[in-house]
């Protein structure tokens, strides 16, 4: 029975970015080290890179502070973006019409794992 914890997670819920756009950013950093992922996300032009950056940094901080894992050995083991609730709005159009506007939200989850722990 191993009592040592080798992974930590962080979740951002109800983020105002579409899940499809968030997944596009997440796919670029999945499997990379935390430091490399943060460098990529810091300069990525996509709007979804900011919330993903915050979740990755939070997961790394959780691993470091809650479980005593070394930040330099952390790797993004899993990352995904689920669909949150959709806010529905109306955009008035000509001649009394109205178009539906769907403002989609995401739940972004990142799991970081100690590379040394997964090698054992």
Swiss-Prot record:
Organism domain of life: Bacteria
A single Gene Ontology CC term: cytosolic large ribosomal subunit
GO biological process entries: translation
InterPro entries the UniProt entry points to: Ribosomal_uL22, Ribosomal_uL22_bac/chlpt-type, Ribosomal_uL22_bac/org-type, Ribosomal_uL22_CS, Ribosomal_uL22_sf
UniProt cross-references to Gene3D superfamilies, sorted A to Z: Ribosomal protein L22/L17
PROSITE patterns tied to this protein: RIBOSOMAL_L22 (PS00464)
Keywords: Ribonucleoprotein, Ribosomal protein, RNA-binding, rRNA-binding
Keyword Ribonucleoprotein on entry: yes
Any GO MF annotation of the entry: rRNA binding
One Pfam family of this chain: Ribosomal_L22
Similarity comment text for this entry: Belongs to the universal ribosomal protein uL22 family.
Function: This protein binds specifically to 23S rRNA; its binding is stimulated by other ribosomal proteins, e.g. L4, L17, and L20. It is important during the early stages of 50S assembly. It makes multiple contacts with different domains of the 23S rRNA in the assembled 50S subunit and ribosome. The globular domain of the protein is located near the polypeptide exit tunnel on the outside of the subunit, while an extended beta-hairpin is found that lines the wall of the exit tunnel in the center of the 70S ribosome.
NCBIfam families referenced in this protein's UniProt entry, alphabetically: rplV_bact (TIGR01044)
Quaternary context: Part of the 50S ribosomal subunit.
Protein name as catalogued: Large ribosomal subunit protein uL22
């Amino acid at each position: 029975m191993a009592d040592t914890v080798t992974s930590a997670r962080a979740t951002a819920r109800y983020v105002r970015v579409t899940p499809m756009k968030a997944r596009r950013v997440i796919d670029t950093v999945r499997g990379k080290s935390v430091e490399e992922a943060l460098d990529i996300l810091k300069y990525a032009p996509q709007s979804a890179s900011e919330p993903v950056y915050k979740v990755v940094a939070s997961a790394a901080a959780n691993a470091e502070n809650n479980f005593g894992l070394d930040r330099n050995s952390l790797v993004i083991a899993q990352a995904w973006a689920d669909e949150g609730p959709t806010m529905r709005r109306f955009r008035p159009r000509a001649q009394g019409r109205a178009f539906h506007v769907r403002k989609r939200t995401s739940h972004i989850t990142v799991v970081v794992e100690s590379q040394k722990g997964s090698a054992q």
